[in-house]
Amino acid sequence: MTNIRKSHPLLKIINDSLIDLPAPSNISSWWNFGSLLGICLGIQILTGLFLAMHYTSDTATAFQSVTHICRDVNYGWILRYLHANGASMFFICLFLHVGRGLYYGSYIFMETWNVGILLLFAVMATAFMGYVLPWGQMSFWGATVITNLLSAIPYIGTSLVEWIWGGFSVDKATLTRFFAFHFLLPFIIAALVMVHLLFLHETGSNNPTGIPSDMDMIPFHPYYTIKDMLGALAMILALLALVLFSPDLLGDPDNYIPANPLNTPPHIKPEWYFLFAYAILRSIPNKLGGVLALVLSILILILMPLLHTSKQRSMMFRPLSQCLFWLLVADLLTLTWIGGQPVEHPFIIIGQLASILYFSLILILMPFVSIMENHLLKW
């Protein structure tokens, strides 16, 4: 008699995805981030659901409702801070997951990679709209500045911005629709995750060497379920430490001031995970040019499979490419720092140089060095 997990229509899907799935025997802890992202999404949906039960998406009461959650709702404060810092954890895992994909050549699985980029955009959109909901100063002005960027689009720009706002400024209509979309998008993300996994399981996982591992596979359970549980434990521990010891470490103090359209904060900046893109946006003096650079800074990931000129898939045995990869990481950290600084000397020129280096590394230097390595190895 066949085991029920192998014959039952529903259990069979779970079995083929989480239990009997053949996985390479040599995948390292860098492969843990997929499951960690799944846990992050689960935490965000759960905490968000309970927060939505007490939140009101009205400009007159939104700020007060968040205060009410923190002060009067049982364990409301921990829900709110788990949700806010859970987003930061989500992005840490996302960046590491994408970085892993770049380093080990996972982008060769083009369908999985492209769905992943779509997921990245969806998560960024969700996080941006979520930041607007507490209706603090930075929420209001962040929403105003970022949505206003669309006015740089020729001909339809102004109409598009007013259509998104639902009026002539960020107001009640904007907050209500942002709340609606912020609630809806995580479920769309969950559906996209299923598609992402579907494409991944068509090809099987990559591994650190970049060499096909068909001849050396092990079952996902118990080996990688245990490994994922250890990663999850570490991440949840880090998240709880952040929430319970310094919940406002990654937030902006200006967001504890209720939104005031008549008073602009001295430095308008987004959450830390958008700062690298914000720095690229600010480094170009032209508005449309800046918006294009902002979009391309993420969209450039789509070109990765086309820019792969090496005969080897992974960077594991390519020291020159490794140097450029870590230079790219350092460059992104520099951009993140610059994004949080005021627009003045010397930050302007540092931001411009870091932006030029970012695009040069991905479009020119890394493909060129890969060709050079092929010649050095006489391939």
From Swiss-Prot:
Keyword Nucleotide-binding: no
Superkingdom field: Eukaryota
Record-listed a ubiquinone binding positions: H201
Gene Ontology biological process terms in this record: mitochondrial electron transport, ubiquinol to cytochrome c
Note describing how the cofactor binds: Binds 2 heme b groups non-covalently.
InterPro entries associated with the record: Cyt_b/b6_C, Cyt_b/b6_C_sf, Cyt_b/b6_N, Cytb/b6-like_sf, Cytochrome_b, Cytochrome_b_C_euk/bac, Cytochrome_b_N_euk/bac, Di-haem_cyt_TM
TM regions (residue ranges): 33-53, 77-98, 113-133, 178-198, 226-246, 288-308, 320-340, 347-367
Pfam families: Cytochrom_B_C, Cytochrome_B
Cofactor(s) listed: heme b
Binding site for heme b b562: H83, H182
Membrane disposition: Multi-pass membrane protein
One GO MF term attached to the UniProt entry: metal ion binding
Alphabetically ordered keywords of this record: Electron transport, Heme, Iron, Membrane, Metal-binding, Mitochondrion, Mitochondrion inner membrane, Respiratory chain, Transmembrane, Transmembrane helix, Transport, Ubiquinone
Localization per record: Mitochondrion inner membrane
Cellular component per GO, a single term: mitochondrial inner membrane
Stored Gene3D superfamilies: Cytochrome Bc1 Complex, Chain C (1.20.810.10)
Ligand binding (heme b b566): H97, H196
Similarity remark: Belongs to the cytochrome b family.
Oligomeric form and interacting partners: The cytochrome bc1 complex contains 11 subunits: 3 respiratory subunits (MT-CYB, CYC1 and UQCRFS1), 2 core proteins (UQCRC1 and UQCRC2) and 6 low-molecular weight proteins (UQCRH/QCR6, UQCRB/QCR7, UQCRQ/QCR8, UQCR10/QCR9, UQCR11/QCR10 and a cleavage product of UQCRFS1). This cytochrome bc1 complex then forms a dimer.
Other comments on record: Heme 1 (or BL or b562) is low-potential and absorbs at about 562 nm, and heme 2 (or BH or b566) is high-potential and absorbs at about 566 nm.
Function: Component of the ubiquinol-cytochrome c reductase complex (complex III or cytochrome b-c1 complex) that is part of the mitochondrial respiratory chain. The b-c1 complex mediates electron transfer from ubiquinol to cytochrome c. Contributes to the generation of a proton gradient across the mitochondrial membrane that is then used for ATP synthesis.
PANTHER family referenced in this protein's UniProt entry, alphabetically: CYTOCHROME B
This protein's name: Cytochrome b
The organism of origin for this protein: Epomophorus wahlbergi
Name of the gene: MT-CYB
